[in-house]
Every structure is written in structure tokens, then in C-alpha cells.
Amino acid sequence: MPRVLAIETSCDETAVAVVTADVAWPGFAPRQLSSVVASQIDLHAAYGGVVPEVASRQHVETLPFVLEAALQQAGLEVAEVDAIAVTCAPGLVGSLLVGLMGAKTLALLYDKPLIGVHHLEGHLFSGFLAEPDLRPPCLCLLVSGGHTSLIWMKDYGDYQTVGRTRDDAAGEAFDKVARLLGLGYPGGPQIDRWAQQGDPQRFPLPEGKVEHPYDTSFSGLKTAVLRLVQQLQQQGRELPIADIAASFQACLTHVLTEKAVACAEALGLSTLLLTGGVAANRELRARLREAARQKGLRVVIPPLALCTDNAAMIGAAGLCHWLRGEVSPLELGVASRMPLEGIPSLYMDGGGAHREEQTGSAAL
């Protein structure tokens, strides 16, 4: 069975995994032999958000230990894997460089193919780790701190973004509202926790209207919460934090659910995949399951450990590319931004355009 060692350092998690597949290509059923994640949440909480310089330095310190733990968990040596996969875009440049340099070092030392992986494609592949019988085509609702997108997965490696946020990503909106309510960082889990005790109908909030049927906009919702908080404070009233959190969460998750289900129906797709850090939200998971059930759609929601950033999803995507004969040049660089349509440039079969001179040097 093929085995890929994967590294993920795009933001504030240092992660390493070993992934294999039970079914030979073109069938694809990946599974993880190991997955180790070292989170920096507590480190960044004091700053109210991720500090790029702090994140990259922490990756440098942590990566060797996480790598060793993942290999021990899998019962393997680096020499026994078939390829090295690594997140190279999008993300924090300094953090990405740490992972890429580590991956290049291993690829050169052990003479292994290097496979650069787009972080968002990794999130798509978390669904295949969760349910091995999942096959494209399907529609993915990807919701995280930096991205909110509806992605039509037509086939392995063939993606079309059919809906996106016009401003704040869902996770960003959660963080900003949590900050307004004094709930701390990260905001998503805090809002989710408080909302369980609140009345979601107490404060009607705007859903945000955009012309495109599947795009979203959360800046208006965030501003409405700000004005509500200011109004209550001016009146000298105690903030009903649970009710505000519940009202905000209900509004945001309703928008995401309605657009995802409508888009899947319009495209004639029978399967919906929910992934990304915000997929851990209990209200969103419940709403999407119920809405999909009413429409006769299948819903795939990975376990929480696969929704947040991890290296297993990067390994699954990397393994898919390796099975397709796609490998990256050692001149591979990193990029803070890259659309899914840029994925072919990561591989030599795609022209190998994603080189150090275009994205910042990461060559050894």
C-alpha cells in the first residue's frame, strides 16, 4: 500500500500525519496511519488572534517533535514512505515556509518525491478520510477562519468555486462578534457554548443580501451585532450574552445552510460535504443535516479532529496527486493566496509554474 508523510503548518497548528490507501487508483479510500497536531491556540489567545511571527517561530520549535511522534505512531521510518506531502498555499508565508523547508529536507535526504498541496484541497479530502465510500461529484461547504466557499468537486483535482464570501469569512465573523461580547479567542467555540443557553429568536438580525445566489456577506451581520451591543450599553442594560450569541449564530448558520442546499439542488448533486474549522459548530451541523434530510441529500461531516487544520487531510490530497503521477519540483515555493484553480501549477505536469521566483524563495 502506498504511504505518504504529510506536513501542515499553514497557520497556527503544527501537524504531521502518515496516510495510506486501501484501494488502488482510480478508486480512492484513504486512511490515516497516524496524525499528530500541536495547537498554538493558548499561545495566541493572549493577543486575541494569531500573530504570524510567533506562529512561525513556534513551528520551528515544534515540528521536529511532532514529526517524530507521527512516525512513532505509524510505526514507520521516513525511508519507508513513498512521498512527502506539504501544504504550500494559501496561508501565513512564514508558517508555510517552515513546513516546506522541512518537507524539502526530508525529500532530499531520503530521495522521496515532493508533493505540494493546496490547503483548501486538503479540507475537501477530509471527507474521504471520514467516509471511504465518498466519491465525486459533490458540493463542499468549506467554512473556516479565513475562507467561506461553496466548492463543486467535479472529480479528483477538478474543482469550481460556485459561491464565496464577499467580505468576512464565517470564522472571522465568529471571532469578531465574540470579541464584541468579551468572550475571548478563539470566538467560534465560545459563541457555540454560550448560544446553547440563549434564545435564538430574541434579536432579529440581517442575513446580508448579495446579488449572487450562492455568495455570502457577513459584514452587515457583524455591524448589526455591534450596534445592538452599543445600544444596550447606552441604555445601561446588562448584555444578554447568551441571547445575542444564539441570535447571531442562528442567523449565520441559516444563511450557510440555505445557500448550500439550494446550490446542491441547482447543480443536481446528491452529496454535501461540510468541512473547515467552523464545521465544528453544533448549530451548523444540525441545521445542515436537517435541511439535507428534507431534500433527500446525503451529508458528510468529518469528525471534529478532521474539520480543523490537520496533516491527515493534506496527506490524503497528496496521496491522490501521487497516485495520479503528479509531483512537485524542488523549486516549489509558498503563497499567501492561491485560488483552487491554481492547483495545477504546483505540479510538474501542470507546468511547474509555482516556483520560488513567483512566490518567495523556499528552495534549499
From Swiss-Prot:
NCBIfam families: gcp_kae1, T6A_TsaD_YgjD. Its EC number is 2.3.1.234. Pfam families: TsaD. This is tRNA N6-adenosine threonylcarbamoyltransferase. Coiled coil: none annotated. Belongs to the KAE1 / TsaD family. Required for the formation of a threonylcarbamoyl group on adenosine at position 37 (t(6)A37) in tRNAs that read codons beginning with adenine. Is involved in the transfer of the threonylcarbamoyl moiety of threonylcarbamoyl-AMP (TC-AMP) to the N6 group of A37, together with TsaE and TsaB. TsaD likely plays a direct catalytic role in this reaction. Binds 1 Fe(2+) ion per subunit. GO terms for molecular function: iron ion binding; N(6)-L-threonylcarbamoyladenine synthase activity. SUPFAM superfamilies: Actin-like ATPase domain. Keywords: Acyltransferase, Cytoplasm, Iron, Metal-binding, Transferase, tRNA processing. It is found in: Cytoplasm. The keyword Metal-binding applies. GO terms for cellular component: cytoplasm. Signal peptide: none annotated. GO terms for biological process: tRNA threonylcarbamoyladenosine modification. Substrate binds at residues 142-146, 175, 188, 192, 281. Its cofactor is Fe(2+). The keyword DNA damage does not apply. It is an enzyme of class 2 (transferase). It catalyses: L-threonylcarbamoyladenylate + adenosine(37) in tRNA = N(6)-L-threonylcarbamoyladenosine(37) in tRNA + AMP + H(+). Fe cation binds at residues 119, 123, 309. Its main location: cytoplasm. InterPro entries: ATPase_NBD, Gcp-like_dom, KAE1/TsaD, Peptidase_M22_CS, TsaD.
